[in-house]
């Protein structure tokens, strides 16, 4: 028969109780789902977004649910605002951070010949540069916590062709950054992993759902025959932050209903 102490240790492996987390871009879509997932599992969460009105609406909802969430306005494409964000996080959490979810990002989808220099710079600054810089300036806080976990919200577009070359390049670079940091920071007890969603029901993918032919093409490409839901992504993010995932680092994991491994098959 298991002892009470052993049961307690087993439960703590599957809990975020007492942990602190920063989730960027948490006012909608995947970020909102991640904030709720982590808070529901016991973490104290700070999140940011560009839209203050939307952020305050979410905050009222989270407070009504009893979640411990604080917020601040931040455009992660701005280096100055990223530094201010981390100062705020350090103050809120007394210089220690267990979890960093680099979720904020943007997408510009167009033929490669039509991408402008401004498109390229904006995509790289928002998706890649911000993820690296936030990880870099969060490093002292993650190390101070004694056990840190970074999760990059990447995309299947970083692994296979999806018709968005520069967007895909920003996510592919993010995946490699995750592998590099995982190796470099393992000695500081900081784990780093990337999560790659396929088409998920969020505001970012609304253009797909408004086009019946495009939606059907996505579903046909996906072995499971449907698009994903935000909570199917946030559950993986939470798992990677659990103590139970303490030996998982440097991984790039798809949440895609099998889309990224699907080849071609003809069914007459």
Swiss-Prot record:
EC number(s) on file: 1.1.1.-
Keyword Cell inner membrane tagged: no
One GO MF term: oxidoreductase activity
Active site: 167
InterPro entries xref list: NAD(P)-bd_dom_sf, Sc_DH/Rdtase_CS, SDR_fam, TR
SMART domains cross-referenced by the UniProt entry: PKS_KR (SM00822)
Binding site for NADP(+): 22-46
Binding site for substrate: 155
Keyword NADP: yes
UniProt keywords, alphabetically: NADP, Oxidoreductase
GO cellular component: peroxisome
Matches recorded under SUPFAM superfamilies: NAD(P)-binding Rossmann-fold domains
Enzyme class: oxidoreductase
Family (UniProt): Belongs to the short-chain dehydrogenases/reductases (SDR) family. SDR65C subfamily.
Summary of the function given for this chain in its UniProt record: Enantiospecific reductase active on cyclic monoterpenes and small flexible lipophilic carbonyls. No activity with tropinone, nitrogen-containing tropinone analogs, tropine or pseudotropine as substrate.
Protein name per its UniProtKB record: Tropinone reductase homolog At2g29150
Organism of this sequence: Arabidopsis thaliana (Mouse-ear cress)
């Amino acid at each position: 028969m298991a002892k009470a102490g052993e049961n307690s240790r087993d439960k703590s492996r599957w809990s975020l109780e007492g942990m602190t987390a920063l989730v960027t871009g948490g006012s909608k879509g995947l970020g909102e789902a991640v904030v709720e997932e982590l808070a529901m599992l016991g973490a104290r969460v700070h999140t940011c977004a560009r839209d203050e009105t939307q952020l305050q609406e979410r905050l009222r909802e989270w407070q009504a649910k009893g979640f411990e969430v604080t917020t601040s306005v931040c455009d992660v494409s701005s280096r100055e605002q990223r530094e201010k964000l981390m100062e705020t996080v350090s103050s809120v959490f007394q210089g220690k951070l267990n979890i960093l979810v680099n979720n904020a990002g943007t997408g510009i989808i167009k033929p490669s010949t039509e991408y402008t220099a401004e498109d390229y710079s904006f995509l790289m600054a928002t998706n890649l540069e911000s993820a690296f810089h936030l990880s870099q300036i969060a490093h002292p806080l993650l190390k101070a916590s004694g056990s840190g976990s970074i999760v990059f919200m990447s995309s299947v577009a970083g692994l296979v062709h999806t018709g968005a070359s520069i967007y895909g390049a920003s996510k592919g670079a993010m995946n490699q950054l995750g592998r590099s940091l995982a190796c470099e920071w393992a000695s500081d007890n900081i784990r780093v992993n990337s999560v790659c969603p396929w088409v998920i029901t969020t505001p970012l993918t609304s253009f797909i759902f408004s086009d019946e032919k495009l939606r059907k093409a996505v579903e046909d490409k996906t072995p499971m025959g449907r698009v994903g839901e935000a909570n199917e992504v946030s559950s993986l993010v939470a798992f990677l932050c659990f103590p139970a995932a303490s030996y998982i680092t440097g991984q790039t994991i798809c949440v895609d209903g099998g889309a990224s491994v699907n080849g071609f098959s003809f069914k007459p």
